[in-house]
């Protein structure tokens, strides 16, 4: 099962690719301005110079391409070329229900088995206890 942001990324990256732009520039990030939108993409800015188009035109093309997608409740191109996105509540509910059906609740299995060693170091009772003794365990010195 794909994580939520990967699903959004796939849809937006496909739109960029279908319009003839670099697929990887369609990467979506969580918005640092939640008052404006939930997610944002600045791929139009990255493609503007290479394709010799204004970033706003590219952003508007991508928004038009994505307008029919039921994943988004709100899509808008804003100056200088950002694409602001809000996710449809029904899509989010469907995603959570899909997670509930999965026995691992959407958490993917580890691809590589790793061994983790946890050392619970204790104070040496033969020496006086002070802050310097705790650094050996905290930093990982032997």
Regions found by a protein language model. Give the residues of each.
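Conserved alpha/beta enzyme-core scaffolds, especially Rossmann-like or related mixed alpha/beta domains
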Residues: 21-30, 76-79, 115-121
